[in-house]
């Protein structure tokens, strides 16, 4: 489930920087939740265009770092751990299983 949350966060930060919808971004993150997370810019595209052609590497590195610490930012702002986003991620996985929609999720 962490992969779904982290991928959504990564896509959101990229979308904000590029002024596009997160729905137009395809991205892949590997590893655990937090510092061990590995976003893969090589496999990140915006409407099929590699993100590395749309944004400079320094800005991309900053977005990756923000993605890694984004959960902690949320906890500091809310004063508690998130509950809505993990629930929504779990619901997406359950729906995909029940409906046999053959969706691929980045989970660990």
Regions found by a protein language model. Give the residues of each.
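Rossmann-like NAD(P)(H) cofactor-binding subdomain of soluble oxidoreductases
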Residues: 1-11
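Long, compositionally biased stretches enriched for glycine and/or charged residues
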Residues: 15-108
């Amino acid at each position: 489930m962490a992969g779904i949350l982290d991928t959504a966060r990564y896509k959101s930060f990229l979308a904000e920087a590029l002024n596009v919808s997160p729905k137009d971004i395809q991205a892949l993150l590997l590893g655990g939740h937090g510092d061990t997370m590995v976003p893969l810019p090589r496999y990140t595209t915006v409407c099929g265009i590699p993100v590395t052609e749309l944004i400079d590497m320094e800005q991309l590195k900053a977005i990756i770092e923000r993605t890694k610490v984004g959960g902690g930012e949320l906890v500091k702002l809310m004063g508690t751990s998130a509950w809505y986003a993990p629930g929504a991620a779990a619901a997406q996985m359950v729906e995909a299983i029940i409906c046999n929609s053959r969706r691929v999720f980045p989970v660990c």
